[in-house]
Amino acid sequence: MIFSTLEHILTHISFSIVSIVITLHLITLLGNEIIKPYDSSEKGMIATFLCLTGLLTTRWIYSGHFPLSDLYESLIFLSWSFSLIHIVPYFKIRKNDLTTITASITIFTQGFATSGLLNEIHKPTILVPALQSEWLIMHVSMMILSYAALLCGSLLSVALLVITFRNIFYSSKSNNLLKLNESFSFGEIQYKNERNNIFQKTSFFSDKNYYKAQFIQQLDYWSYRVISLGFIFLTIGILSGAVWANEAWGSYWSWDPKETWAFITWIVFAIYLHTRTNKNLQGANSAIVATLGFLIIWICYFGVNLLGIGLHSYGSFTLTYS
């Protein structure tokens, strides 16, 4: 009873803090000169990380096994992983706008985990025989950590694409306006004034565009490194899962839905890393591959749980509304 109450308190505290954090991040992003809300939001994210750590520890003690046996526990661990990835850059770069993106996905995952949709699996259960193995910690934790890193890195790539295509759109719009001015043959002075005004607004070297260019470089830099880390975790997770499968079922690979989608995920991000070796494909081109990977990961993570089939169906669930 005490553990259940403590778990309930930590869950709601962590969700409340992360809700406040994302609000502060949005304020900081809109007003770039505001420093205090940013510092407060980062401290709040650290507090969220500590609450989630306490929640997982409490559930581990209460259930008697590592809390990765069902969808609810994996979502909490995924939120914990997101918050960990969020706070690591904070100690390296005290002021980093990229954390707004990672905070957003943290609150989304935490919100879904604590929502009424998963009420039936909030309570700890006895581990099924197939999961009673030391490989549970190694395999599942590596897979969830890889999902967290790959999702964060892919989300940064999505943001890079949005900003890049938005800049292209406004740039082409400005060029069309210049051509329109030329076609109507305005007076030379009027045309030059109009052209100078447009250049002042759209020049790449203006303060606003310079900030965007720097932000795009940061997105590209961090997305590549976070995805690389996630790819390593994914590789370790797949290999450890193959060893565990051989011990449990007598075969390293059986092509069940989870294994198939994990392999597809691995292939997609292997292609992404390959594109990074070609300078002509870096930036927006590789970001398109990462964006595809973002969708593939969610299919891999939720697909089997929604279908409830295959050898990995232990964490399947049914949506319930209360």
Swiss-Prot record:
<keyword id="KW-0812">Transmembrane</keyword>
<feature type="transmembrane region" description="Helical">
    <location>
        <begin position="287"/>
        <end position="307"/>
    </location>
</feature>
<dbReference type="Pfam" id="PF01578">
    <property type="entry name" value="Cytochrom_C_asm"/>
</dbReference>
<keyword id="KW-0150">Chloroplast</keyword>
<protein>
    <recommendedName>
        <fullName>Cytochrome c biogenesis protein CcsA</fullName>
    </recommendedName>
</protein>
<feature type="transmembrane region" description="Helical">
    <location>
        <begin position="98"/>
        <end position="118"/>
    </location>
</feature>
<dbReference type="InterPro" id="IPR002541">
    <property type="entry name" value="Cyt_c_assembly"/>
</dbReference>
<feature type="transmembrane region" description="Helical">
    <location>
        <begin position="143"/>
        <end position="163"/>
    </location>
</feature>
<comment type="similarity">
    <text>Belongs to the CcmF/CycK/Ccl1/NrfE/CcsA family.</text>
</comment>
<feature type="transmembrane region" description="Helical">
    <location>
        <begin position="253"/>
        <end position="273"/>
    </location>
</feature>
<feature type="transmembrane region" description="Helical">
    <location>
        <begin position="9"/>
        <end position="29"/>
    </location>
</feature>
<keyword id="KW-0793">Thylakoid</keyword>
<dbReference type="InterPro" id="IPR045062">
    <property type="entry name" value="Cyt_c_biogenesis_CcsA/CcmC"/>
</dbReference>
<keyword id="KW-0472">Membrane</keyword>
<comment type="function">
    <text>Required during biogenesis of c-type cytochromes (cytochrome c6 and cytochrome f) at the step of heme attachment.</text>
</comment>
<feature type="transmembrane region" description="Helical">
    <location>
        <begin position="44"/>
        <end position="64"/>
    </location>
</feature>
<feature type="transmembrane region" description="Helical">
    <location>
        <begin position="71"/>
        <end position="91"/>
    </location>
</feature>
<keyword id="KW-1133">Transmembrane helix</keyword>
<feature type="transmembrane region" description="Helical">
    <location>
        <begin position="226"/>
        <end position="246"/>
    </location>
</feature>
<dbReference type="GO" id="GO:0009535">
    <property type="term" value="C:chloroplast thylakoid membrane"/>
</dbReference>
<keyword id="KW-0201">Cytochrome c-type biogenesis</keyword>
<dbReference type="InterPro" id="IPR017562">
    <property type="entry name" value="Cyt_c_biogenesis_CcsA"/>
</dbReference>
<dbReference type="GO" id="GO:0020037">
    <property type="term" value="F:heme binding"/>
</dbReference>
<dbReference type="GO" id="GO:0017004">
    <property type="term" value="P:cytochrome complex assembly"/>
</dbReference>
<comment type="subunit">
    <text>May interact with Ccs1.</text>
</comment>
<keyword id="KW-0934">Plastid</keyword>
